[in-house]
Amino acid sequence: MTMLPFVTLLVGGGLLGPTAPAPHSTETQAVTVTVSSLVSTTSTVKLYFYNTRAGFLKRGQWAFSRAVKPEGKRAFSLPVELPQGEWAVAITQDLNNNDKIDKNFVGIPTEPYAFSNNVRPTVAAPDFNECKFLVDGPGKVVSIVLKDGL
């Protein structure tokens, strides 16, 4: 885990933002991301897909993002096509729909968030290596359990 303050993820990370189109590649594989333990069955869940260590958790540096409405459910599956290689996912759920992650006075999220590999940061933001998974063939399933904010 990097020693960067967890606040970097929350303040400088700027996870919430406009969605971007999926990457285009001729060598993509079907991947299913399953997200469970949603706190709200109506608030939008945003998924940010990263494929570089340098851009991980940096505002606007994700390869692409997706927004999903839970439609009354506490879990969902999102099929995506990803180029082969290393990937990591960061997830947020904007409970009050203000298009940002709300934080307490020390910068810890008060709204739900999660990372691939179900990494649970304590004092510092996770790094790409902790969250990465390998896309090396079809049928990959990435299961992520949302962590409620404080």
List the predicted regions and their residue ranges:
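Beta-strand signatures of extracellular beta-sandwich domains
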Residues: 46-50, 90
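A short, amphipathic beta-strand motif
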Residues: 29-37, 47, 144
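A short tyrosine-centered beta-strand micro-motif
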Residues: 85-91
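Extracellular beta-sheet/turn segments enriched in Thr/Pro/Gly and aliphatic residues
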Residues: 112-149
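Exposed aromatic-hydrophobic patches
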Residues: 75-82
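Bacterial Sec-dependent signal peptides at the C-terminal "C-region" and cleavage site
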Residues: 6-27
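Short proline/glycine- and polar residue-rich coil/turn motifs
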Residues: 67-74, 135-136
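Acidic, glycine-anchored loop motifs typical of Ca2+
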Residues: 95-103
